[in-house]
């Protein structure tokens, strides 16, 4: 009888800078209850289904999009951990253009490098 592969449950973590501040959590806290619920639902889908429901941007950065009441939101994240079971939320913003702005991608890459350099805190 064949064994099923071990399932390593995914979970979201939020990047925090050296002062302990999470820009993504602050962004989410400032949203309306309805828009925050939409973002959390999209994040839950990624947690349950993996990156196949996200968009690969470049290097190790992925994007999840969701529709709020009047806006579209984007969360940039990376997979971390031994089994890539940590979904590290790096940047969040309102979608204003079709393409993800390069400045947002660079910021996510910088935050990922910072997180890794500080021992993945």
Regions found by a protein language model. Name each.
Residues 1-72, 81-86, 93-121:
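Basic, Lys/Arg-enriched alpha-helical interface segments
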């Amino acid at each position: 009888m064949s064994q099923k592969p071990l399932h390593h449950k995914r979970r979201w973590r939020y990047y925090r800078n050296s002062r302990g501040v999470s820009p993504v959590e602050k962004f989410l806290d400032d949203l309306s209850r309805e828009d925050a619920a939409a973002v959390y639902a999209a994040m839950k889908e990624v947690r349950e289904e993996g990156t196949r429901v996200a968009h690969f941007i470049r290097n190790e950065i992925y994007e999840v999009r969701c529709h709020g009441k009047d806006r579209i939101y984007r969360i940039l994240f990376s997979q971390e951990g031994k089994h890539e079971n940590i979904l590290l939320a790096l940047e969040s913003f309102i979608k204003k253009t079709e393409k993800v702005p390069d400045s947002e991608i660079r910021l996510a890459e910088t935050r990922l490098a910072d997180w890794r350099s500080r021992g993945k805190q």
